[in-house]
Structures are given as C-alpha cells and as structure tokens.
Amino acid sequence: MARSISSQGLLSRRRLLGASAAFGAAAVLPGAFRPLTVRAEDVTLTLVAYSTPREAYEQLIPLFAATEAGTGVTFEQSYGASGDQSRAVESGLPADVVAFSLEPDITRLVKAGLVDETWNTDEYKGMVTDSVVAFGVRAGNPKTIAGWSDLVREEVQVLTPNPLTSGGARWNIMAAWGALLKQGKTEDEAKEYLKQLFQHVPVQDKSARESLQTFIGGVGDVLIGYENELELARENGEELEIVIPAETILIENPIAIVNTSANKEKAQAFIDYLRTPDAQKVFGENHYRPVVKEVLDTFTFVNPATLFTIADLGGWADASTKFFDPDNGIVAEVQA
C-alpha cells in the first residue's frame, strides 16, 4: 500500500495494495464500508525522496511487498526537491527511509543525528542509483547543441533548477565546472563560464521535475538535467532529443535509514531489496544507471568521452561550501 504525501501538505493519497500489481489482488478503496483489517505484523514505512525517481519507486514498492521480506509492509511516500526534502526531515517530517539526489542532503541528517555516520560504508558507498548530467534539446536540435560552449551562445536559453533547493541543479553546476577543468581551463575561466551560463537561464525552478515541466511547456532551448529524467520524458512522448556532452559528471544518488524509524529492520530490508538484480533492473528500465555492475552490463548507455566524479573535484564536503554557501559560495558570486 502506498500513499503519496508532500513535506508541505497532502498532495495526493493513493492506496496501492502491495502485491496487487503482481498478482491482481483486490484493493480496499478509501471510503469502503468494510474496514481494512491490519495484521499485527504489518508495518508502514515512510519514504521521503527527491522528485525524479517517483515512477521507479511506484513500480518497486509493490514488487518489494510481494517478497517474503516485504510481506505486510505498506508505504507512505513524499517527493520533492532534494534539498527541501532533506531540510523537512531535519525539521521533523516523519521518515523511515530517505533517498536524495546527492550526498550532502544525507550529510545534513547525519549532522542532525538522524542518520548513522556509517550510512555509506557498505559496498555501494550508500548509493542506490547512478546517472549522468545530460542536455535535453528541442526535436531536431535546431540550435545544434553539442557541448558546454554552445550553452553560452548569444541566442541560446538554458534551463537548470535552483541550486538552493534542487540537488539536480548542484549536479548540473558541478558538471559544468568539471567539464571546463577537463577541457584545460583554469578555475577563474570556469567561474567566468558559470557567470555567463546563468545569464542565459530565464527561470530557476525548485526541482529537476519542475524544470522539466517548464521546458516541456516551451521555455528554453536546452534543459540541463538527469539523463534518466530526460529519457523518461522522451519515452512518454515528449518531443525532445538528448545530448550527452563529451565531458560530464557521474551522478550518484544516496539512500539511508532514518534513526527515528520504529521499523529499522524492514527499512533495511527495503534498501537491501533495492540493490538486488531484480530491483536494479527496474531502475535501469527507468533509465537510471544501475549500481550493481552485473545489471549495468545488461543495459546500453552512452559513454561520454570524459566521465568524472564528484570525488575528482574534491568531494561534496569541499564543494558544498566552495560552491553553494548562500553568502560566499561561487554560485552566489556569479549570480550577484
């Protein structure tokens, strides 16, 4: 069973009987005359996540519920901009499992005592999916966008979300910065590039999903975003093309258990399930790059000429302050 909620209030409520998707069992609908009987072993987990994996989790939750470990487990779900979701949990939004866009949104909860310091010591370093930063362009690529230099041409408008709220926006900025360095530019030249880039951004939405909707609505020539988000939009019939720049960053998406969970064993079972080949295949079918190599190898993804990681740029501990300090960071400086 799954219910979708928002950290700012109820957005939608959905009742999904865990195994019904797999076995066609009848669901008890809200308002039915017969009360739902809850077994003593049944538990509810709350998943608080960033916006883009919603479709994947709505497929995975009933599949987990159909496993022995997931028997009797129902879910409440909350999706939104990664930074906003992390701050909401820090401020008291109930959560058992958090799945965010980037590591600093977990680190915030570690500092608050809400996530164990050992959250990223497993073989996957706390990650559940990967992706890359890509460009979405209009059908036919009328602006002939091929690489980062094309985004600052005079006639080009670019969409990227707000880095104060969106994890995806931070990945985009680090991708641009790293690409310039990989091209042999200096940090001063990379900073000047970011300044020019933001001059081409007409609107900064709160999340990657909202930024995609703005692009679909006709604003902008290029959308910088998650490869998986762009692929999903194209699969759903949106008229866009995807460009993988020669230099881009590997996006690494973390997941963790919240210490205040009353059901840590089931929460861990859910995370363990998400790293099984079956679950990773579902992520791959939703255009994420699986973190389980044997599953990754069964998919065909475009391999950029130069793929770098956040570790290559000094890691998030350094980047969070250097780039995203709201008063003194590089992003604040180039947008002043």
Give residue ranges: language-model regions.
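N-terminal secretory signal peptides
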Residues: 1-11, 19-31, 36-38
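N-terminal segment of the mature folded domain
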Residues: 40-165, 298, 304-306
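Ligand-binding cleft/hinge of the Venus flytrap
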Residues: 62-69, 152-209
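Hydrophobic residues within well-ordered alpha-helices
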Residues: 89, 214-218, 255
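Periplasmic-binding protein-like
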Residues: 127-131, 194-198, 205, 234-268, ...
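Short helix-loop capping/hinge motifs at secondary-structure junctions, enriched
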Residues: 140-146, 178-186, 261-267
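Ligand-binding pocket segment of bilobal, Venus flytrap-like solute-binding proteins
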Residues: 183-246
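Extracellular/periplasmic juxtamembrane helices and adjacent flexible linkers that interface
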Residues: 265-336
